């Protein structure tokens, strides 16, 4: 199974370690690959160096200077997560061309879209009982680093491996009328997801998550769930279909 982890769910050290413990427990039942972003950490490191953050359609505009900081921040976070999980191998997507990407839009700078996943490397690590922990820096056509969206990268990994994926975020799932708890959807077919985007009840940062989830399903992932990473015990429940919102083709 693929676990996409990032955002507010990793702001607290205590919460990060709790999620790491859940990942370690889940690993006893099935192989797990962790794909992570690092928005809050990247923001902090950029601000400390006086580099302004700029976004376009939810994607970070990434200059070569900012890319160096992004890669450094993700490498540090990757090491921390790997240590928290235990029996894990921390990798950035550039390592062994694990994630290969093309430039998404020259106007965004060093921002890419994953075009190939080194699934063989991941299967080799899983085969010897290790948990790959993947930070979202890909290798571009020129061999240099590209910043890739963690949601879409995780979806690409799920599709390449043909495994289910759980996106951990800071809400319990997808709401038809947020924050009404009664409107939390336990399951959404593609047609209703598209309607939700069109009608505005799926918006903002949730859009790339649902797009990535649908792309993962199209590529062969058997399931995709969006669930909260802010509460203990959710990960295993989401994997069983008992928490979050499960997207279906």
Swiss-Prot record:
Gene Ontology BP terms: arginine biosynthetic process via ornithine; L-arginine biosynthetic process
GO CC annotation: cytoplasm
Stored InterPro entries: AceGlu_kinase-like_sf, AcgluKinase_fam, ArgB, Asp/Glu/Uridylate_kinase
Pfam families registered for this protein in UniProt: AA_kinase
Swiss-Prot/TrEMBL keywords: Amino-acid biosynthesis, Arginine biosynthesis, ATP-binding, Cytoplasm, Kinase, Nucleotide-binding, Transferase
Pathway: Amino-acid biosynthesis; L-arginine biosynthesis; N(2)-acetyl-L-ornithine from L-glutamate: step 2/4
Top-level EC class: transferase
Catalysed reactions, as listed in the record: N-acetyl-L-glutamate + ATP = N-acetyl-L-glutamyl 5-phosphate + ADP
GO MF annotations, alphabetized: acetylglutamate kinase activity; ATP binding
Keyword Ribosomal protein: no
Lineage top rank: taxon: Bacteria
Binding positions (substrate): 38-39, 60, 147
EC number annotated for this UniProt entry: 2.7.2.8
UniProt KW Calcium keyword: no
Annotated site residues (Transition state stabilizer) in this chain: 4, 209
Subcellular location: Cytoplasm
Membership in a protein family: Belongs to the acetylglutamate kinase family. ArgB subfamily.
Purpose of the protein: Catalyzes the ATP-dependent phosphorylation of N-acetyl-L-glutamate.
Protein name (Swiss-Prot/TrEMBL): Acetylglutamate kinase
Native source species: Deinococcus geothermalis (strain DSM 11300 / CIP 105573 / AG-3a)
Gene name per UniProt: argB
């Amino acid at each position: 199974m693929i676990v996409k982890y990032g955002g507010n769910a990793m702001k607290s050290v205590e919460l990060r370690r709790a999620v790491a413990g859940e990942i370690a427990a889940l690993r006893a039942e099935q192989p797990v690959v962790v794909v992570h972003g690092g928005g809050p950490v990247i923001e902090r490191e950029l601000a400390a160096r006086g580099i302004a953050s700029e976004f376009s359609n939810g994607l970070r505009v990434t200059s070569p200077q900012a890319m160096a900081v992004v890669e450094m921040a993700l490498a540090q976070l990757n090491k921390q997560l790997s240590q928290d999980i235990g029996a894990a191998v921390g990798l950035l997507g550039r390592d062994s061309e694990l994630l290969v990407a093309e430039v998404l839009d020259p106007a965004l700078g060093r921002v890419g879209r994953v075009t190939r996943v080194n699934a063989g490397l991941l299967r080799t690590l899983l085969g010897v009982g290790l948990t790959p922990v993947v930070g979202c820096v890909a290798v571009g056509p020129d061999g240099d680093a590209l910043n890739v969206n963690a949601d879409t990268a995780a979806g690409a990994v799920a599709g390449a491996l043909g495994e289910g994926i759980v996106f951990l975020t800071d809400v319990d799932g997808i709401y038809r009328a947020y924050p009404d708890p009664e409107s939390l959807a336990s399951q959404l077919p593609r047609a209703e997801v598209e309607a939700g985007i069109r009608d505005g009840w799926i918006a903002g940062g949730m859009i790339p998550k649902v797009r990535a989830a649908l792309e993962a399903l199209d590529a062969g992932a058997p399931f995709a769930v969006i669930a909260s990473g802010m509460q203990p015990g959710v990960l295993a429940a989401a994997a069983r279909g008992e928490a979050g919102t499960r997207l279906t083709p």
